[in-house]
Amino acid sequence: MTTSGTRPAHRPSRKQWVIEAATELFATQPPDEVTVADIASRAEMTSAAVYYHFSSKDQVLAEAMRAFAAALREQLQSITEAQEPGSHTGAAITALLAWMAENRSAATVFFVSSTGMSQEAEALRQESRTQLLEELVRLVRKSRASVSDAEAAVNGLGLLALLETAATSQVRGDDVYRSLGHRSFVREVGDLAERIADPAW
């Protein structure tokens, strides 16, 4: 979705329009440097129209993070449900990484730009981690028929750490990502996921 074209006031999609415009800005500039006026300009509306839906810039950031976290969890749930019992976890993790690449701006805001911005942002990130961990433990259980609760929890934590690190590396395009190239990077992430989920792999 693009932010070209002026929207009539109070249209039902107007709030989402603000979130998407803000996400584009937060992904390319430090959020503390972005103003409500900047968001309004990007969304092609007035600052008053932004304040109609949000009390502050921080609330827009929180809503953007909350929307991404919900979509990320839903995507992982779908991947886990589709996972065949006994199949490898690498493909599931790389599929989630590919989805985040398709939603790069939102992923950048969630994993990079919003870090340390506010207590609410950190609380949202922690809540998301807890939810993702639950799904990753389910994924481990589907891939390994005989795994103890403790081992599934540890493996799930390992997958969560890998996912967060890989997502951050990908959206930043850091030295590791650039030196490997996209295909090799994704392949390495998949192989690591397999070793984490099943050390005997």
Where are the predicted features?
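Helix-turn-helix
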Residues: S13-W17, A21, L25-Q59, E63
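Amphipathic alpha-helical packing segments from all-alpha helical-bundle domains
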Residues: A70, Q119-R144, A153-L157, L180-D191
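Pre-recognition alpha-helix immediately N-terminal to the DNA-recognition helix
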Residues: W17-L25, A71, A91, A95
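Hydrophobic alpha-helical connector segments
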Residues: E63, Q77-S105, S146, N155-L159, ...
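Short secondary-structure transition hinges
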Residues: A98-V137, R172
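C-terminal peripheral helix-coil segments that are non-catalytic and often amphipathic
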Residues: M1-T3, A98, E102, E134-K142, ...
